[in-house]
Amino acid sequence: MAQYEKLKTLADGLSDKMTMFVNHEANGRSGHLSHALAEYKKGSVIAFYSNCSGKRNRWAPGHNGFGWLEYKRSNDGGLTWDEAKVFPYSWESFLNEPFTVSCEKAVSTQENEIVALCIRNENPNGWEPYLTPVAVRSEDGGETWGEAVEICDKRGRIYDAIVHEGNIYLLLLANDDFLAVKPEHRYYIYKSEDHGKSFSLQGELPGDTANHAYGSMVIREDGSLVCYEYDSSDEFNLVYHISDDMGKTWKESGKGFCAKRIRNPQVARVSGGYILHGRAGCMTKDLPMHFVLYTGTDGIHWDEGRYIYVDQGQTAYYSNNLVMDRDNGTQRVLIQASIPYSKGCVNIGHWLMEI
């Protein structure tokens, strides 16, 4: 319990700890959706982000995927970063294909390997409809990249990916639009046993998916897998499903209360407990639409939460996290999120927790 109290104290102290990672405002650009993070060697981190139009999308100029992906790398666990590099597949697609590319998740199963899990967007003023997702691999720490390989024949969006016992597991909502509105709009788990070269269907999540979107996964201390879904009709309660066999079967489903609401949830297990962060809802104006961070002891029940970035972000706060185990037995947690600066335009911020 002392370790959890330390975690809560650290979380409470993050509100003034944001550092600017990408200043899109300087160029009138924006950067939604793509926040893939991976540690591909001890202390070596890759962080993706999008470089997109600051004007497209009449509803919220800057809230779109019309552009390409870039990434930076760090050799000191996210303290300092090298110069940005363009992700080749996204640039080639932007120039020559009828779709753009986003990347919300990346993983690594061995040293210097990076597997970027990409979604493909047909709408030049937004994202949807989505095409089938693809994986793009690097075996030299992001110096060069291979060809894109289709992950499955289902159109949709990859919401999370984790590595367990050397295998990759990803969470896909099979829906070419945003919210699930049809019976066939289901969440699936896919598995790769060959470092992201191919994927096979592992299982299907249970329950009603009507009005659901987004998702996250975490492996708890007891080895159980928890998958989460966002319910747009109930932003105070985060849907969860628990499996003891990595998504083949499910033993429990329910909802976890989030006092400040949650949208696009991102969950991680850290020393002392669990963290959950995302936009603090936006379907109504009852509460602020800030960037919220919760802590908990079991990945199901959450504390009262705290805002770690305060600005009305109706289209902001897409986020991700990376937990790094350090040689001295401590952990460093990197959180990356889009932060608003004008209408639908966003910069990219970083937060670091030393646990």
Feature roles, as predicted:
Residues 2-355:
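Asp-box/BNR beta-propeller blade signature and adjacent active/binding-site loops
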